[in-house]
From Swiss-Prot:
GO terms under biological process: intrinsic apoptotic signaling pathway by p53 class mediator
Region (Required for induction of apoptosis): 1-105
Region (Disordered): 54-75, 189-259, 268-287, 331-352, 378-397
Role played: May play a role in p53/TP53-mediated apoptosis.
Lineage of the species this protein comes from: Eukaryota, Metazoa, Chordata, Craniata, Vertebrata
Originating species: Mus musculus
Interaction with p53/TP53: annotated span: 106-482
A Pfam family reported for this protein in Swiss-Prot or TrEMBL: zf-met
Descriptive protein name: Zinc finger protein 385B
UniProt entry keywords in alphabetical sequence: Apoptosis, Metal-binding, Nucleus, Repeat, Zinc, Zinc-finger
GO cellular component, one term: nucleus
């Protein structure tokens, strides 16, 4: 008897009275072989059910049930009913029968248990929301935990930590952004940042020292009209200037630019520089340069930037700075002379260090240089330093011999060279042996002793060949058998 026929007969017997339609019978049939309660396995077809019921695992579980031992529980299984095994099996006539030899069971006993099984469409795990506040409440020390523990709890319970905003550290002076406090600290302590801050401070202080054109336009007291107008305009301007001078305090910055009554109008260039209008002495200019150098920590004469006032003082007391100051003033051994054709440039251009477009002469070393850069290089050279310190000159290395040569030796050498350069007679080269002898004699180096050259030079008659034919040397003979 086949398993499929058995299931069909079981369905006809069990569902004879309650068959509302074909669709309901198909569902019941599907439920019968869709699930095995003993092994808790879902079966999808009759052939799959036949193979499962004939297997060893199913027989073993059925044997355990028949002996009264409950099989090991399976997760998600439904408790078994008391009684014989609910799985169908072949009849007694079959050759390979199942261990469960029960015949048919009533449909009322078996159907409700099968109807209680979950269908294939139901998900085994259902997601349920977990409140984040409850998870934090479970862990009272959640805020003080390690970041690894927090990450594990967040992944498990879904606790979301609000993302922290990244702190942006930037330098508005240098237009830079930093990733950490250590980077920002290193930048603020650096020389580049300090130089830019000093340059900004210098630009802020400049409008206070020198009035700009806009401020001159805004303040009628500082604006001076040229003296080419009518007399009525001049009187009005003088009245305005007197009124403003009486209203402004004497200690204000703008008071130094006001004109006194009865003075002639000055050009705008004289008003723009307060140091010139107050005192034209060179001492005040030098003081202002020192003050600027202290503010900016920069020596405009030597073009050297320093980081502190102590470094600036050490530089000012150094020999290089003093030498440059002496070169500018012309008081030391280095004298400065104006370069030809550069007077117009000096008048039109800015002052600077006062050493532009000049030539310099070092009297100690007797050296002329053409620019300020060359002067600095010469001052820092070893030659100038040794001369200033009074050290003797070091001899320069030369590959040539510096022995003093006597005039007699030089005269003898010149006479011998002249004799060798004279044209020889044609009989001199009459034979190859004589030519070889002459060439070998000419190639000999002259002896250094002066005793050979005290007499007259060797006459050319001594170099002539002797009387009679001279036999030439025979050529070598090679023996070749083939």
């Amino acid at each position: 008897m086949n398993m499929a026929t058995f299931l069909r007969g079981f369905e006809e017997k069990g569902l004879k009275n309650d068959r509302p339609g074909d669709q309901f019978s198909k569902e019941k049939k599907k439920i019968l072989f869709s699930f095995c309660e003993v092994c808790n396995i879902q079966l999808n077809s009759a052939a799959q059910a036949q193979v499962h019921y004939d297997g060893k695992s199913h027989r073993k579980r059925v044997k355990q049930l028949s002996d009264g031992q409950p099989p090991p529980p399976v997760q998600g299984s439904v408790p078994l009913l008391a009684g014989p095994c609910p799985c169908p099996g072949p009849g007694p006539n079959t050759s390979t029968g199942s261990a469960c030899h029960t015949t048919t069971l009533p449909a009322l006993v078996r159907t409700p248990t099968l109807m209680m099984q979950p269908s294939l469409d139901i998900k085994p795990f259902m997601s349920f929301p977990v409140d984040s506040s409850s998870a934090v409440g479970l862990f009272p020390n959640f805020n003080t935990m390690d970041p690894v523990q927090k990450a594990v709890i967040n992944h498990t319970f879904g606790v979301s930590i609000p993302p922290k905003k990244k702190q942006v550290i930037s330098c508005n002076v240098c237009q830079l952004r930093f990733n950490s406090d250590s980077q920002a600290e290193a930048h603020y302590k650096g020389s580049k940042h300090a130089k830019k801050v000093k340059a900004l401070e210098a630009t802020k202080n400049k409008p206070k020292m020198v009035p700009s054109k806009d401020s001159a336009k805004a303040n009628p007291s500082c604006s001076i009209r040229p003296g080419t107008g009518d007399s009525s305009d001049k009187s009005e301007d003088k009245g305005k200037i007197k009124a403003t001078s009486s209203s402004q305090p004497s200690g204000s910055e703008g008071g130094s630019f006001l004109l006194k009554s009865g003075t002639t109008p000055l050009p705008l260039g004289a008003i723009a520089s307060p140091s010139k209008s107050t005192n034209g002495a060179p001492g005040s200019v030098a003081e202002s340069e020192e003050e600027k150098a202290k503010k900016l920590l920069y020596c405009s004469l030597c073009k050297v930037a320093v980081n502190s006032l102590s470094q600036l003082e050490a530089h000012n007391t150094g020999s290089k700075h003093k030498t440059m100051v002496e070169a500018r003033n012309g008081a030391g051994p280095i004298k400065s002379y104006p370069r030809p054709g550069s007077r117009l440039k000096v008048q039109n251009g800015s002052k600077g260090s006062g050493l532009q477009n000049k030539m310099f002469h070092c009297e100690i070393c007797d050296v002329h240089v053409n620019s300020e850069i060359q002067l600095k290089q010469h001052i820092s050279s070893r030659r100038h330093k040794d001369r200033v310190a009074g050290k003797p000159l070091k001899p320069k290395y030369s590959p040539y011999n510096k022995l003093q040569r006597s005039p007699s030796i030089l005269a003898a050498k010149l006479a011998f060279q002249k004799d060798l350069m004279k044209p020889l007679a044609p009989t001199f080269l009459s034979s190859p042996l004589a030519a070889a002898a002459v060439s070998s004699a000419l190639s000999l180096p002259p002896r250094p002793s002066a005793s050979l050259f005290q007499a007259a030079a060797i006459p050319p008659a001594l170099l002539r060949p002797g009387h009679g034919p001279i036999r030439a040397t025979p050529a070598s003979i090679l023996f070749a058998p083939y």
